[in-house]
Regions:
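Active-site microenvironments that recognize anionic phosphate/pyrophosphate groups
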Residues: 2-171
């Protein structure tokens, strides 16, 4: 069900390095954020959105043989892997389609909080371990630079690459 823009959304006009751009910030039902960027002011209602799995625990562990640190994130085993074209979580939402991470039917560029991040935000607390370990804290986002299901950075054109750089600078 689509819902109108509400208190969970804002549209910000930004002065980019090359031109004016807009950012639409949307808070999803699970608390994660989605930011849409474009050279024109974004419009449209939010549609169905994927809801995150909730809390997860990741930890840093030190490998005593290699003297290196590694991130262990068991919850990532349930992440989406090679979905069917009709269940693409990075596709724009369409009426009658499955929920997606981007609950808007039109966008130029989208950045959202990673549902399957190896890192966790906030105070993760300590994880009991007999080895040297600690919380794996940080923030991970997913960048979707086109609403098309085909293409790459070369095929999107220079204007879209400029928008991508402007959005990354804003982040």
């Amino acid at each position: 069900m689509a819902r109108p823009m509400d208190e969970d959304e804002t549209i910000v006009k930004l002065q980019g390095r090359s031109q004016i751009l807009y950012r639409r910030d949307h808070i999803k039902a699970d608390g994660r954020s989605v930011s849409l960027y474009g050279f024109s002011s974004p419009s449209g209602l939010a549609g169905l959105e994927l809801v995150g799995l909730g809390n997860h625990r990741s930890e840093l562990r030190r490998d005593p043989l290699r003297n290196t640190w590694a991130i262990y994130s068991p919850h990532r085993q349930s992440r989406t892997f090679m979905p069917a074209r009709t269940a693409d979580p990075l596709a724009p939402w369409r009426a009658g389609s499955a929920p997606t991470e981007i609950p808007f039917s039109e966008f130029e560029l989208a950045i959202f909080d990673n549902q399957f991040s190896s890192l966790q935000t906030g105070d993760a607390g300590s994880v009991p371990s007999q080895w040297a370990s600690g919380p794996a804290t940080g923030h991970c986002e997913v960048v979707v630079y086109t609403s098309e299901s085909e293409g790459d950075l070369q095929s999107i054109g220079q204007e879209r690459r400029v928008l991508l750089i402007e959005a990354l600078i804003d982040r």
